[in-house]
Amino acid sequence: MKKEVRKVRIALASPEKIRSWSYGEVEKPETINYRTLKPERDGLFDERIFGPIKDYECACGKYKRQRFEGKVCERCGVEVTRSIVRRYRMGHIELATPAAHIWFVKDVPSKIGTLLDLSATELEQVLYFNKYIVLDPKGAVLDGVPVEKRQLLTDEEYRELRYGKQETYPLPAGVDALVKDGEEVVKGQELAPGVVSRMDGVALYRFPRRVRVDYLRKERAALRIPLSAWVEKEAYRPGEVLAELSEPYLFRAEESGVVELKDLAEGHLIYLRQEEEVVARYFLPAGMTPLVVEGEIVEVGQPLAEGKGLLRLPRHMTAKEVEAEEEGDSVHLTLFLEWTEPKDYKVAPHMNVIVPEGAKVQAGEKIVAAIDPEEEVIAEAEGVVHLHEPASILVVKARVYPFEDDVEVTTGDRVAPGDVLADGGKVKSEIYGRVEVDLVRNVVRVVESYDIDARMGAEAIQELLKELDLEKLERELLEEMKHPSRARRAKARKRLEVVRAFLDSGNRPEWMILEAVPVLPPDLRPMVQVDGGRFATSDLNDLYRRLINRNNRLKKLLAQGAPEIIIRNEKRMLQEAVDAVIDNGRRGSPVTNPGSERPLRSLTDILSGKQGRFRQNLLGKRVDYSGRSVIVVGPQLKLHQCGLPKRMALELFKPFLLKKMEEKAFAPNVKAARRMLERQRDIKDEVWDALEEVIHGKVVLLNRAPTLHRLGIQAFQPVLVEGQSIQLHPLVCEAFNADFDGDQMAVHVPLSSFAQAEARIQMLSAHNLLSPASGEPLAKPSRDIILGLYYITQVRKEKKGAGMAFATPEEALAAYERGEVALNAPIVVAGRETSVGRLKFVFANPDEALLAVAHGLLDLQDVVTVRYLGRRLETSPGRILFARIVGEAVGDEKVAQELIQMDVPQEKNSLKDLVYQAFLRLGMEKTARLLDALKYYGFTLSTTSGITIGIDDAVIPEEKQRYLEEADRKLRQIEQAYEMGFLTDRERYDQVIQLWTETTEKVTQAVFKNFEENYPFNPLYVMAQSGARGNPQQIRQLCGMRGLMQKPSGETFEVPVRSSFREGLTVLEYFISSHGARKGGADTALRTADSGYLTRKLVDVAHEIVVREADCGTTNYISVPLFQMDEVTRTLRLRKRSDIESGLYGRVLAREVEALGRRLEEGRYLSLEDVHFLIKAAEAGEVREVPVRSPLTCQTRYGVCQKCYGYDLSMARPVSIGEAVGVVAAESIGEPGTQLTMRTFHTGGVAVGTDITQGLPRVIELFEARRPKAKAVISEIDGVVRIEEGEDRLSVFVESEGFSKEYKLPKDARLLVKDGDYVEAGQPLTRGAIDPHQLLEAKGPEAVERYLVDEIQKVYRAQGVKLHDKHIEIVVRQMLKYVEVTDPGDSRLLEGQVLEKWDVEALNERLIAEGKVPVAWKPLLMGVTKSALSTKSWLSAASFQNTTHVLTEAAIAGKKDELIGLKENVILGRLIPAGTGSDFVRFTQVVDQRTLKAIEEARKEAVEAKEKEAPRRPVRREQPGKGL
């Protein structure tokens, strides 16, 4: 026996789970070999992974046939099995690096982000390699602030923390730095002209372009000066005075030789050479001017220089020792001079300075190294090196530690505070950092950095998710829930819900990151060859191929050790490829087909949307044994029949026919029979006879799209017809909304005997006569039928001689003979009103009357006297004929007499009432017969009546012109009043509109009065009056005037169309009319889509509502008011009869009602008669409201009980258990949706510009519980109104005892209350639509329920749609089934959590029983969309809307679908738990007395034998219902 699915669970798959599903890894992007057309090895269609392409045949063909089943071919590695395994065997792609599942990233709010407390933007920055996320800060500090775990870092920040902060400042060529190499700089300090440091640190020169060596020069030189001028000292510092000359002094040579002159900037040295040898060195201090030049030969005593004033030592020179010899009046000084002599060397880019700034060098030491030894710079003497004009300055955040001896660290080492750096422990680091040993500068630099663990991409997120301690996080968040801030609590709640979802489901957060991507079975993403040798392939193959290519490329790059930036880019591309496979286009631009704009369909696209798996393939499938064709009318058919084209029937019933042909020996076997049918010309007459036999007793289903309600599919008994069109009974057209202007219908054959029986009993057209929405007949006479029946039941009224009085009948007859009185003119004879016809024609029985008509003595419409069923009637032969027709159809003329109103013509409504009364009194079968009779005679009579339309039938009343002239006069008065300033423009406009509205109404009345008095048999009038075609508005436009037209904006043109169509429109009138026509067309198109969508939302919210039990036992009820407040007079008046009927009919009384001496007991189902009785009682002032059970108060979970629902309106009897009342309600509300107007009226008067939403948009607004645009201000408390007027505002105070509430309103607000009025909470103070959410807060759920039902009904009633309240109540109940927790008490619930009222109430019962604090909650009002998405069934919600969001939420919570509603069962292909699929019907055995007795005996025996095993299924009596 097939196992029955009871629940369906959805959860996250772990990487191990994904691998366990897989039959092998897909390693190559290849699909199939284009030459052999066989799948490539390790590719996306590999037979080794996914199974063989042909049944029981391996790839190489070594093993064929079923006997090798299960064997794996040793040659090709393919398992021998059925090829169907290629529909469910999966593969996988092992990712080179983890990738996040986009559903959990991009869902709102992001699931991964919620758990890790990251915003969606932050999470994306990490996943797509824009920022690092810190996994372990390891004491890192950024800009003086400690780095925290999960902090995001930019590339720059990460490099700074990991490798230290450094900045390079390039310098223009030839510009020297303002700081020295190795100098400490601060932020804002100028490093070079125009170059400012942006950070603190150590400045290091990069590539100095110039080196200056300050060579240390020493020289012993002589100087003779006047003794009197000498300033005597042992040594001289730079710039000190040697002598103070009072008069010029010539210094003369003491040796002869060639002069060599050396300039010392502030002095000179003179060398005298004899050949190569220097014979004398003379020092000329500052203040002495040389008198000789380079190369000059001097003799002893020749003046060398002249001194004047002060003689000083140059400022860059010192004289360390001075030897003085006094010779007469002069002194001979020998000075030991020391000075620095700078020398610049250019450094080319290919040369390298190998000494640091300030280094001391000895002669012969290398300063600048170069490849070419010629270019090297060698020190000429002892000196100090200075670096200049660096190409750039590097500022590094580091500590510099000079060392003398051994370095104990190497470059790249990481050190912490206290770690030894050099000199045997003397030099230690004071910070965290990375070591740079600088042997050129003899320092150890510790660049401030940290061994921080921060990463990018999904692997970083996976690591964080793995580390999460959910229990600890739950405790922390529960603490956070106690925070006073509401925003903080709300955020904590959202996080807590996700945390608990993971904890309760057993899912692990890190499973949201994929390590392996599952590959769909190949037959679910096929590749097929199309004409021309090309291949058509599923988009998924392209997406998988892209993913495999990127994955393989990344593996290769990782193996090759590619640079970090390339790896990072490749990882990002891999993440994007995984995203595209799962949900293409969710982030960034979608992947498209090369050369086209069409995005590729990813896994998500395959699931969601109208074309997705759920809606296209699971909730709606194309079925076998079906066909479609154009429909034509079949007036000869019975109500339960349809005409099925022979060829179509042959195909539809082929299997049955083949069997029959074999049985009757038309063919030896099925194969031959099939061949015979395929050759069309071989079909013999006996085959058609066999087909007749096959279809005998069978029904087919006919469906017309759009199927807006359940009557869009009905069962019919097929009748074989020639031709190719399906013939449809005219009376079912209304249910299908079909006409014969080219409509098509589909035919389906129910195959099993169960299906046939169900279709015949429950879906047969003759069994679906009443509308499930209102309980009124749907199969009812219309169009021609009404026309024919109205024609014969109309009576002729004539004017000639009307009102004449006669003493005796003979006198009257004599006057008729003389032509003074017409046959049907009302006259008075002996004080009694009568007519000549009644006196002249007196028949003993109906047959005589009808014979007289046949002989042409009378018309059907003449009033005569007939004896009928023992009564003397004054009526027309036509009415007698009608009574006859009905009597014959129902088989009882007496009953017919009771059903028919003989004294009125039979128009649309009276015929509808006739059908309904017949249904109630005579049942379905006889009603169907009656309908067929009415159809037959209606068509016949409308044909013989000869009613046609000619142009002269549009008769224009004479009064029209008078009314128009009167209107023009009033119009001039209005214009004058406006011009004189008595009216505002708006008031003028309103009055003009009002004037023309009244005028049009007068013209309409004149048209009909004219018809009634002068042309009672006018075809137009007859059609409109009978309800056959046309309405007063259309007749008005034909014969009266078109009246006011609408602008596209919805406002009204103040210029009316005065002409009628009979007269013809002027150009301007035609132009004005065209606006409205176009708007009508646009509205209809929009309306159809909106209406269909609304129906879908309603079905989704209500489909689980099924009648589940007989009585829920509730004591709650609703009171249906019989009176309502009149909008204009503000007084109570009785509601319209039809409104009361749609509120009360078919309901169960919740309390006893006594009125007019009659008692209606509690628990009674209210029939239409009962409702009419209650209306009478209300008129007599004995009843104001009626207490009834309602779905709103029903206590049955996931449904309603029989008592709270009441009648099944389509059967006019109590609803059966298992009836899918939720879907019926949704269809009943949605089906008339297209009829509702789109208009949003612009209201006149003060509040200009405020739109009052009406029609379909208003219905949608109410069902979606939206806050209305033009909102009414409502009172939040009971109290007395006090109004204060300010300069620009109104203040309305509602005052109750010790409390007052103020409402500030604009000055032009339209108030509904006066000073001193008493108002209740929830009562509107101003005009406008009430916000249902505010009403819920002010007055509670009951008030909102009532408001929503009333407001929705208002819209439907305005369009003349009759709809029972209980359908709306079922949907409204679903809108109010959720509550919000305000205080969790002792439960695990959270403040602000939303859940079903049932669950909270059940939990509270448990808590109270355990003596704990119960949960406090407040009711919530949800729109149908939100309510449908909040349902417990994840299958139902996902197949409705927001598929990815629903599945994401369900997966993390590991949700179980209990399969309670209809949709989820349809999706799984189970019988729906409603109707014949409900357990109540399926497990109910129908038994007779004998079987009951046998069961009783068996039970006794069982008890005696004390068998422990209980009977598996309870045996119950079948309850009355529609179940099989």
Curated annotation (Swiss-Prot):
<dbReference type="Pfam" id="PF04998">
    <property type="entry name" value="RNA_pol_Rpb1_5"/>
</dbReference>
<feature type="binding site">
    <location>
        <position position="76"/>
    </location>
    <ligand>
        <name>Zn(2+) 1</name>
    </ligand>
</feature>
<dbReference type="Pfam" id="PF05000">
    <property type="entry name" value="RNA_pol_Rpb1_4"/>
</dbReference>
<feature type="binding site">
    <location>
        <position position="1112"/>
    </location>
    <ligand>
        <name>Zn(2+) 2</name>
    </ligand>
</feature>
<feature type="binding site">
    <location>
        <position position="58"/>
    </location>
    <ligand>
        <name>Zn(2+) 1</name>
    </ligand>
</feature>
<dbReference type="GO" id="GO:0003899">
    <property type="term" value="F:DNA-directed RNA polymerase activity"/>
</dbReference>
<dbReference type="InterPro" id="IPR000722">
    <property type="entry name" value="RNA_pol_asu"/>
</dbReference>
<dbReference type="InterPro" id="IPR007083">
    <property type="entry name" value="RNA_pol_Rpb1_4"/>
</dbReference>
<comment type="similarity">
    <text>Belongs to the RNA polymerase beta' chain family.</text>
</comment>
<keyword id="KW-0548">Nucleotidyltransferase</keyword>
<dbReference type="InterPro" id="IPR007080">
    <property type="entry name" value="RNA_pol_Rpb1_1"/>
</dbReference>
<dbReference type="InterPro" id="IPR042102">
    <property type="entry name" value="RNA_pol_Rpb1_3_sf"/>
</dbReference>
<dbReference type="Pfam" id="PF04983">
    <property type="entry name" value="RNA_pol_Rpb1_3"/>
</dbReference>
<dbReference type="GO" id="GO:0008270">
    <property type="term" value="F:zinc ion binding"/>
</dbReference>
<keyword id="KW-0240">DNA-directed RNA polymerase</keyword>
<feature type="binding site">
    <location>
        <position position="60"/>
    </location>
    <ligand>
        <name>Zn(2+) 1</name>
    </ligand>
</feature>
<dbReference type="GO" id="GO:0006351">
    <property type="term" value="P:DNA-templated transcription"/>
</dbReference>
<feature type="binding site">
    <location>
        <position position="743"/>
    </location>
    <ligand>
        <name>Mg(2+)</name>
    </ligand>
</feature>
<protein>
    <recommendedName>
        <fullName>DNA-directed RNA polymerase subunit beta'</fullName>
        <ecNumber>2.7.7.6</ecNumber>
    </recommendedName>
</protein>
<dbReference type="InterPro" id="IPR012754">
    <property type="entry name" value="DNA-dir_RpoC_beta_prime_bact"/>
</dbReference>
<comment type="subunit">
    <text>The RNAP catalytic core consists of 2 alpha, 1 beta, 1 beta' and 1 omega subunit. When a sigma factor is associated with the core the holoenzyme is formed, which can initiate transcription.</text>
</comment>
<dbReference type="GO" id="GO:0000287">
    <property type="term" value="F:magnesium ion binding"/>
</dbReference>
<feature type="binding site">
    <location>
        <position position="1201"/>
    </location>
    <ligand>
        <name>Zn(2+) 2</name>
    </ligand>
</feature>
<dbReference type="InterPro" id="IPR006592">
    <property type="entry name" value="RNA_pol_N"/>
</dbReference>
<comment type="function">
    <text>DNA-dependent RNA polymerase catalyzes the transcription of DNA into RNA using the four ribonucleoside triphosphates as substrates.</text>
</comment>
<keyword id="KW-0804">Transcription</keyword>
<dbReference type="InterPro" id="IPR007066">
    <property type="entry name" value="RNA_pol_Rpb1_3"/>
</dbReference>
<keyword id="KW-0479">Metal-binding</keyword>
<dbReference type="GO" id="GO:0003677">
    <property type="term" value="F:DNA binding"/>
</dbReference>
<dbReference type="Pfam" id="PF04997">
    <property type="entry name" value="RNA_pol_Rpb1_1"/>
</dbReference>
<dbReference type="InterPro" id="IPR038120">
    <property type="entry name" value="Rpb1_funnel_sf"/>
</dbReference>
<keyword id="KW-0460">Magnesium</keyword>
<feature type="binding site">
    <location>
        <position position="741"/>
    </location>
    <ligand>
        <name>Mg(2+)</name>
    </ligand>
</feature>
<dbReference type="InterPro" id="IPR045867">
    <property type="entry name" value="DNA-dir_RpoC_beta_prime"/>
</dbReference>
<dbReference type="GO" id="GO:0000428">
    <property type="term" value="C:DNA-directed RNA polymerase complex"/>
</dbReference>
<feature type="binding site">
    <location>
        <position position="1204"/>
    </location>
    <ligand>
        <name>Zn(2+) 2</name>
    </ligand>
</feature>
<feature type="binding site">
    <location>
        <position position="1194"/>
    </location>
    <ligand>
        <name>Zn(2+) 2</name>
    </ligand>
</feature>
<feature type="binding site">
    <location>
        <position position="73"/>
    </location>
    <ligand>
        <name>Zn(2+) 1</name>
    </ligand>
</feature>
<dbReference type="Pfam" id="PF00623">
    <property type="entry name" value="RNA_pol_Rpb1_2"/>
</dbReference>
<dbReference type="Pfam" id="PF21668">
    <property type="entry name" value="RPOC_hybrid"/>
</dbReference>
<dbReference type="InterPro" id="IPR048566">
    <property type="entry name" value="RpoC_hybrid"/>
</dbReference>
<keyword id="KW-0808">Transferase</keyword>
